[in-house]
Amino acid sequence: MESSEGRTHSADLEAPARDVIDQGRAWIDEHEAELLEFLSELVSQPSVTGREGTHDDPESVVGSLYDTLEAETERATLDVQRVPDDDRGPRENCYAVLEGATDELFVCTSHTDTVAPGDDADWPGTDPYDVSVGTVRRSEPGAIELTVGGRREKRTIRDAYDRVWDRRDDTERDVLVGRGTYDNKASVVCLVGALRALESALGDHTLGGTLVHGHLVGEEIAQVGAKAMVSRGDRTGWFSERFSDPEGTVVVMDGSYGFMPAVGHRGLAWVTLRTEGESTHASTPHLGSNAVLETAKGLATVEEPSFRETIASPFIDDSLLGELTVAAGTTIIGGDVRRDREGRLERAGVNAVPDWCETTFDVRFPRWEAYPNDPEAIRAHLEETIASHVEAEAGDVDVTATVDPAEYFPPVALADSREAARNHPLVSQTIEAARSTVGYDPGVTVAPGVTDAASIYSATRLPTIVEYGPAGALSHEPLEFVERESVIDGAKAMIELTIRQLGVV
């Protein structure tokens, strides 16, 4: 096991950097109960995307976060940014900036929104927002057994989390169960704990560069908080107004595998295909043009080599991020079908040939030859390729394919391969911070989904770790959990990583 390497405790660093880290870690140990209580407080405030709230609403998660930062920090400058209102209500990004001796930046982000909890009955005590204490153990490779609230559940886990169990000596961990514990309020606590510890430990010293913490709204839907921070496209957001020519690095804090740095992720495009035909009475279907049927003809042939070759043509053979995948027909609707707010389906026009149909494609894609330049050409290629394919297979219908810019996220990659990524200065420092904290080399991974890094990197072009955070699982499922020890380890890892990136003067 790699855990036999032991904790290095930053032995490669010199004073005063090592002293600040040691004192900061001691502060975190002394305030462990307080930090865990803060996590419970954040979880108790529902923040499904759109309900994150504002700094002047103490009953919201953003208000609670801001109040804590205002009360418990002295050197950091706090700021908020109203994200443009939509039907989801007013909400704000929350920032903490600790000025350093130079313009070198270390930017760390988290997100404050969660997905919906689902059925309350699936959670301990029927309350997804009341943190429950349980245990988790790996029952066999690729599977865990979670015990909480008198229940025992066996679940499969991702390979990266499974590998973490191979690296550790213990076979069981205490966990905290609740909606948002893992995704992503534990990461918020890691950053707040690290900042408070850093202020306590710096004394007469200052950071060698400037630390920026951004707690962002709307990650789960369209990354609206990250886009507002960096204003992807025109660079007039909060970040670029303050740092016009930024130099530095970025770490996106998110529920992960125990501080195993994710060095990239594929891009994502949700393509909406609309087919319009001609309606007629169902007794004479030959007089119309069935939009649903013609759409189905196109969907039935997307696995053919000719389509695969065409849609994959701009992309490189990407050994880091992997190959392009196309999931066709992820949703489909046509004719006169409605779903009410309670989820009941209502049908009308069952005796009519449908004159319209919409279906969606989920496309995950690697880098292209000109990456990261010209991402809009890739978006246009996906639209044109899918529309042309369905149009060629279908009959007398009109076909259009569109990718909403809000649903288009370019890939992010730190290097050409995992081996090369390990040697990137930012990655090597995240590994050392983790090794010093948890006692083993966590390795590197590639994130399975997109994170706020897609928006942040495309606007700033700063080297970015796309995911780094505490260990846990079941992020979008009932019984979501984070490992208790990993929350505290996260604060320790982030204070060390901050010192490694910026130094102390």
Task: Spell out what each predicted region is.
Residues 168-264:
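Acidic/histidine-rich catalytic neighborhood of metal-dependent amide-processing enzymes
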Residues 4-181, 200-207:
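Acidic/His- and Gly-rich active-site-bordering loop/insert found
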Residues 93-97, 250, 272, 360:
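Conserved hydrophobic/aromatic beta-strand scaffold that supports enzyme active sites
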Residues 105-107, 176, 246-252, 272, ...:
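Short glycine-aspartate micro-motif
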Residues 123-129, 230-232, 268-269:
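Glycine-rich, phosphate-binding/catalytic loops in enzymes
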Residues 1-30, 47-48, 60, 77, ...:
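Metal-dependent amide/peptide-bond hydrolase catalytic core
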Residues 109-111, 215, 251-254, 467-469:
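Short beta-strand segments
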Residues 58, 62, 66, 188-191, ...:
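Short, highly selective alpha-helical patches that border small-molecule cofactor pockets
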